[in-house]
């Protein structure tokens, strides 16, 4: 048996429920693997962020989620928004997730965490940073 203690599963792919989401979460829980989830956000307003939170909440309602619900903020559609606008969007998502009894976090790449997002404006102070290895010849 692998020593996998948890997974973070994506919820959306190309605007719809990830086609592998239900199978992945069912297999993980059946094998005693703790589960968290994330959504790659396309939200450019607080209303859109709440809609994304509701999308996630509807998906996970029947599953035992024991790890965070992450809001992945790094899409180019959000790139020209101010730090205050981005914080308001993140806070809207996190408030909705927290109110439903889950633990929200922010997920972003290093550039976004260091230059685009101001964590001091966020209602949560925890982030999850992607760390990609440098692979010669690969564009990332």
What is each PLM-predicted segment?
Residues 8, 36-40, 69-74, 107-108:
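Acidic beta-strand-to-loop metal/phosphate-binding motif
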Residues 54-69, 76-140:
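Surface-exposed substrate-engagement region within the catalytic domains
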Residues 2, 34-37, 71, 89, ...:
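Generic detector of short, locally flexible boundary/turn motifs and exposed helical patches
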Residues 19-23, 51, 84-88:
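Generic recognition of short, well-ordered alpha-helical segments
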Residues 1-38:
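N-terminal carbohydrate-binding/catalytic regions of secreted carbohydrate-active enzymes
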Residues 11-15, 39-46, 76-85:
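Second-shell loop/turn segments in exported
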Residues 31, 43-46, 139-140:
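Aromatic- and acid-rich polysaccharide-binding/catalytic face
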Residues 19-20, 43-57:
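Glycine-rich anion/phosphate-binding loops
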């Amino acid at each position: 048996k692998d020593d996998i203690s948890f997974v973070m599963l994506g919820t959306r792919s190309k605007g719809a429920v990830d086609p592998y989401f239900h199978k992945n979460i069912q297999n993980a829980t059946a094998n005693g693997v703790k589960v968290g989830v994330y959504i790659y956000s396309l939200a450019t307003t607080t209303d859109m962020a709440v809609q994304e939170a509701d999308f996630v909440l509807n998906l996970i309602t029947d599953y035992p989620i024991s790890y965070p619900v992450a809001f992945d903020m790094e899409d180019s559609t959000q790139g020209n928004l101010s730090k205050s606008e981005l914080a308001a969007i993140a806070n809207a998502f996190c408030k909705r997730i927290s109110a439903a009894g889950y633990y929200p976090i922010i997920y972003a790449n290093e550039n976004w965490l260091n230059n685009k997002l101001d964590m001091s404006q966020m209602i949560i102070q925890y982030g999850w940073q992607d760390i990609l290895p440098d692979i010669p010849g690969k564009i990332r």
